[in-house]
Amino acid sequence: MCLQIGGGGMDLRGQTFTLEGVAASLLILLAVYTIFQSTVVIAPSWSDYANVQLKQLGYDILRVFDSDGGNSSLKGAIVNCSSGFKAPDEFNANLSKILDSLNAFGKVELIWVNGSKIESHALYGFNKTPTPDAVRVSRFVVVQDLNNSECFNLTTPTTKVVEVRLTLWRT
């Protein structure tokens, strides 16, 4: 049965099927995007299969620490670091426990733009020299107010984006 509007013979079912198709394609795109954001994609020609698990664990570590968990979060470590780039004790203890359970070592670097130059510093306690087969993962953290932080000698009081770079390796 067709619904006729004004005698033109327009079928509203066609429009309904088009909208369903658009909604289904958006849902599929969202699912594919989510899958590729949460996993490491391995190309068949990639020869470094041994470090894939360590790299995925690195992404997971940064994802876990990127929460509103006070001093034990990435944002808390950035805002509340003391001079010499020493992160709060809660952050250091939690990251050390995770690295010990993985039998891995880690280096944590903070990278940010200060005026017209890019600055980079490693966190105290996580500043060892990595081995050549180390893997590196990073996450960007938006921090609203870094003026009170002892670690950042900022010339501008605006919101900052800090890259937290985690380098992992096993011996």
UniProtKB/Swiss-Prot annotation:
Q: What is this protein called?
A: Uncharacterized protein AF_0762
- Membrane topology, as annotated: Single-pass membrane protein
Tell me the classification of the organism that encodes this protein.
Archaea, Methanobacteriati, Methanobacteriota, Archaeoglobi, Archaeoglobales
Q: Where are the transmembrane segments?
A: 21-43
* A GO CC term attached to the entry: membrane
Which cell locations does it reside in? Membrane
Alphabetically sorted, this entry's keywords are: Membrane, Transmembrane, Transmembrane helix
One Pfam short name? DUF7288
Work out whether the entry's keyword set contains Transmembrane helix.
yes
Source organism superkingdom: Archaea
